[in-house]
Swiss-Prot record:
The keyword Chaperone applies. It comes from the Eukaryota. The modification Phosphoserine is found at S204. The gene is DNAJC11. This is DnaJ homolog subfamily C member 11. Gene3D superfamilies: DnaJ domain. SUPFAM superfamilies: Chaperone J-domain. Its main location: mitochondrion. The keyword Cell cycle does not apply.
Length: 559
């Protein structure tokens, strides 16, 4: 199966693989590997001008790898950020003998400085589109009572409300951000809109403030002030003051939230709202890798309620989540359950069924696409009908699995193949260069390999008969796929020492004489070797460690 191709796959040399050492290798192991490769690639050992030039290039690459890994600071940078981290401007002013954590902080600081140069080009658009659908005619029919009324025999499904909101952010400086937002709403033929402008300033690492001005056709001007402050490392407070101007006068409002981390996964909130819909609310939220739990209690005018909800997070590639909640108060009782799942890299689709008294039964469908949200609340019935609950539950499941199998999955597969092919084309030049370097390395190894084979044959030791690296197709259903393997017999024989061959847990593409023949796809290494005059065979994954010879690799010829 093809895998996504990362930029690191193309641009970063794997220095550990090049030296064939573990990522935890000691300085002695690094030095031994460096000396062995220096003896192989030193330019002075080759008289032919072309071979001498190739040896010089490979020798410099090996020397660069050793220089990086033998220095604790550059090795820490390379381990965390790869080769690109070493190329980041500003490391020359960093003190030596820093810990990996300090180096990580320094790298992030340098990244922030680079990002500040592009602040003016940044924006953070967010949008919501909500479309309310009245589908009660599907279940609440009055045919028997109104038989004389002429009309269509088909249920009447209509859109009874809509809401659209959009906001963008424009960073002015490293601490100031302007926010412009607007919204439009309509319900049963009546609508209105508003526009808001806010200016946010980060005053320190502990807090920020925001001024907001707004106006709309249904409500008068709005003036607001928001403040955020970290009181302690585990406690923060937010305050929102608002003044709503209208023909009836000024309506003030104040909302204050005090929050405290009870432990690393649990936060407690205490909220007081005065003025517009006064209320006191307290809640506890626990969020872990596999679950999200909320319990809340609100006392207020006009709504008082108790809420408990739970969400389970599955640890799969699609980030599936199932949730359920119970909410009871003076307005009635509502039970809600649903699920959501990632359908593409930037899209999450979810559906929930809401069953309540006196609200009835509703189906809520939500699609999150990047920073855009599309919400469709569908009101099915005002009564508690089992048929409505059944169709609201099973309908979305049937539609989802049908769409996923017939539309989404084939589309994503085609997109993935298209992206992979595009990446292969862009990497073609790099692959050609790697191939030429590998062929040059193999030519430089010939004399050393001849001596190694003579030594191994004299003591009935380890002889690499054949070795292949790349994509192997064994499944009959995939025979049409092209086999992409390269012969790596010589490079592996060159790594044999004292009748042993040891490869570390790293991609074999970085080994001397190797290159990646199928960028972005799964690869294996297959080795046929002879030890003590007996044939052995083994196949390992690209990033799997290998030690030979082993008795388990022996080819049984008795049968």
């Amino acid at each position: 199966m093809a895998t996504a191709l990362s930029e690191e796959e193309l641009d970063n040399e794997d220095y550990y693989s090049l030296l064939n050492v573990r990522r935890e290798a000691s300085s002695e192991e690094l030095k031994a590997a460096y000396r062995r490769l220096c003896m192989l690639y030193h330019p002075d050992k080759h008289r032919d001008p072309e071979l001498k030039s190739q040896a010089e290039r490979l020798f410099n690459l090996v020397h660069q790898a050793y220089e990086v890994l033998s220095d604790p600071q550059t090795r820490a940078i390379y381990d965390i950020y790869g080769k690109r981290g070493l190329e980041m401007e500003g490391w020359e002013v960093v003190e030596r003998r820093r810990t990996p954590a300090e180096i990580r902080e320094e790298f992030e600081r340098l990244q922030r400085e680079r990002e500040e140069r592009r602040l003016q080009q940044r924006t953070n658009p967010k949008g919501t589109i909500s479309v309310g659908v009245d589908a009660t005619d599907l279940f609440d029919r009055y045919d028997e009572e109104y038989e004389d009324v002429s009309g269509s025999s088909f249920p009447q499904i209509e859109i009874n409300k809509m809401h659209i909101s959009q906001s963008i952010e424009a960073p002015l400086t490293a601490t100031d951000t302007a926010i412009l937002s607007g919204s439009l709403s309509t319900q049963n033929g009546n609508g209105g809109g508003s526009i808001n402008f806010a200016l946010r300033r980060v005053t320190s690492a502990k807090g920020w403030g925001e001024l907001e001005f707004g106006a709309g056709d249904l409500q008068g001007p709005l003036f607001g002030l928001k403040l955020f402050r970290n009181l302690t490392p585990r406690c923060f407070v937010t305050t929102n003051c608002a003044l709503q101007f209208s023909s009836r006068g000024i309506r003030p409002g104040l909302t204050t939230v005090l929050a405290r981390n009870l432990d690393k996964n649990t936060v407690g909130y205490l909220q007081w709202r005065w003025g517009i819909q006064s209320a006191m609310n307290t809640s506890i939220v626990r969020d872990t890798k596999t679950s999200h739990f909320t319990v809340a209690l609100q006392l207020g005018i006009p709504h008082s309620f108790a809420l408990i909800s739970y969400q389970h997070k599955f640890q799969d590639d699609d980030q599936t989540r199932v949730k359920g909640s119970l909410k009871a108060g003076f307005f009635g009782t509502v039970v809600e359950y649903g699920a959501e799942r990632k359908i593409s890299r930037h899209s999450v689709l979810g559906a929930a069924v809401s069953i309540g008294v006196p609200q009835g039964v509703s189906l809520k469908v939500k699609l999150n696409r990047a920073s855009q949200t599309y919400f469709f609340p569908i009101h099915l019935t005002d009564q508690l009908l089992p048929s409505a609950v059944f169709y609201a539950t099973m309908g979305p499941l049937v539609v989802y699995f049908a769409m996923h199998r017939l539309i989404i999955k084939p589309y994503l597969r085609a997109q993935k193949e298209k992206e992979l092919e595009k990446q292969r084309e862009s990497a073609a030049t790099d692959v050609l260069q790697k191939k030429q370097e590998a062929e040059s390395a193999v030519r430089l190894m010939q004399e050393s390999v001849r001596r190694i084979i003579e030594a191994e044959e004299s003591r009935m030791g380890l002889i690499i008969v054949n070795a292949w690296y790349g994509k192997f197709v064994n499944d009959k259903s995939r025979k049409s796929e092209k086999v992409k393997v390269i012969d790596v017999t010589v490079p592996l024989q060159c790594l044999v020492k004292d009748s042993k061959l040891i490869l570390t847990e790293a991609s074999k593409a970085g080994l001397p004489g190797f290159y990646d023949p199928c960028v972005g796809e799964e690869k294996n290494l297959k080795v046929l070797y002879q030890f003590r005059g007996v044939l052995h065979q083994v196949m390992v994954l690209d990033s799997e460690a290998l030690r030979i010879p082993k008795q388990s690799h022996r080819i049984d010829t008795d049968g």
